[in-house]
From Swiss-Prot:
The gene is rbsR. Pfam families: LacI, Peripla_BP_3. It comes from Bacillus subtilis (strain 168). Transmembrane segments: none annotated. GO terms for biological process: regulation of DNA-templated transcription. The keyword Repressor applies. Keywords: DNA-binding, Repressor, Transcription, Transcription regulation. This is Ribose operon repressor. InterPro entries: HTH_LacI (IPR000843), LacI/GalR-like_sensor (IPR046335), Lambda_DNA-bd_dom_sf (IPR010982), Peripla_BP_I (IPR028082).
């Protein structure tokens, strides 16, 4: 493995000159800079980012923690954050916790060992002591914690829109899928739907769900139709759950939306490709990731911030799993 001394020798310059070039610290003649870059490419030399951050006392690494990379919603968040951070000269260290506390704690330790400048966390455990005890900033993404910086969407309004749409389509026996009880964002969605359903005085029942994962969604969909076979409308906590319900409804010979209406939440890219295409509530996932990165960098750079708890608007996307009644 090549070292900085090897690069200096190949470029015909001193180690100090290579170091100035790498750290953009001090004057380096353009011709010399070109020789150093060429030598680095020839020797396949890449500087150690952690060592550079320790030397400069300024890390350019950001930790990003997601709960489930198999859910297409979360890569959209990640891409938004990554694009904004890259634009500002930062790099991501990524962790996928699989909604497991042990893995999450291990990744937090990894971030610490790599001297990250801050963390963006779409965590299932925002109230962990580890977050409040960190000596670098944390921004929660698609999650909230009172008093902590966060970027989320208006889930309360979003699922009110979903409930209004499903009632407008004349469903009378509605099943509401409630997301994990310990996540405030999931409970905002639940409470928004609850308000509208009670006002409409329609029959409805609630199924509690422990996670947003694909595996759990499949078993939940089977439970739904086993427990409530007469259900003619489903409001899901996310598009993964809605897709599982759609699949199970079709498997049982139901016509969608004639026999049952289904509305998801997130508007993942695959939602419009399902058959029939899924009606859903669109979260601006890419923009949420981007805003989380902007917020974190603002905190790192000690910039004045107008707001640290950002809530972004959502929209109802009516496709073919809901009826359009006059």
């Amino acid at each position: 493995m090549a070292t900085i001394k090897d690069v200096a020798g190949a470029a015909g310059v001193s180690v100090a000159t290579v170091s100035r070039n790498l750290n953009d610290n001090g004057y380096v003649h353009e011709e010399t800079r070109t020789r150093v870059i060429a030598a680095m490419a020839k020797l396949n030399y890449y500087p150690n980012e952690v060592a550079r951050s320790l030397y400069k006392r300024e890390s350019r690494l950001i930790g990003l923690l997601l709960p489930d990379i198999t859910n297409p919603f979360f890569p959209q968040l990640a891409r938004g954050a990554e694009d904004e951070l890259n634009r500002e000269g930062y790099r991501l260290i990524f962790g996928n916790s699989d909604e497991e506390l042990k893995k999450e704690l291990e990744y937090l330790q990894t971030f610490k060992q790599n001297h990250v400048a801050g963390i963006i966390a779409a965590t299932n455990y925002p109230d962990l002591e580890e977050y409040s005890g960190m000596n670098y900033p944390v921004v929660f993404l698609d999650r909230t914690l009172e008093g902590a910086p966060s970027v989320s969407s208006d889930g309360y309004t979003g699922v009110k829109l979903a409930a209004q749409a499903i009632i407008h389509g004349k469903s009378q026996r509605i099943t509401l899928l409630r997301g994990p009880a310990h996540l405030p964002t999931a409970q905002d969605r639940f409470n928004g739907a609850l308000e509208i359903l009670k006002q409409a005085e329609v029959d409805f029942q609630v199924i509690e769900t422990a996670s947003f994962s694909i595996k759990d969604a499949q078993s939940m969909a089977k439970e739904l139709f086993a427990s409530y076979p007469a259900t003619d409308g489903v409001i899901a906590s996310n598009d993964i759950q809605a897709a599982a319900v759609l699949h199970e409804a079709l498997r049982r010979g139901k016509n969608v939306p004639e026999d049952i209406q289904i509305i998801g939440y997130d508007d993942i890219p695959q939602s419009g490709l399902l058959f029939p295409p899924l009606s859903t509530i669109k979260q601006p996932a890419y923009d949420m990731g981007k805003e989380a990165a902007k917020l974190l960098l603002g905190i790192i750079k000690k910039q004045p911030l107008a707001e640290t708890a950002i809530q972004m608007p959502v929209t109802y996307i009516g496709r073919k799993t809901t009826r359009k009644e006059d």
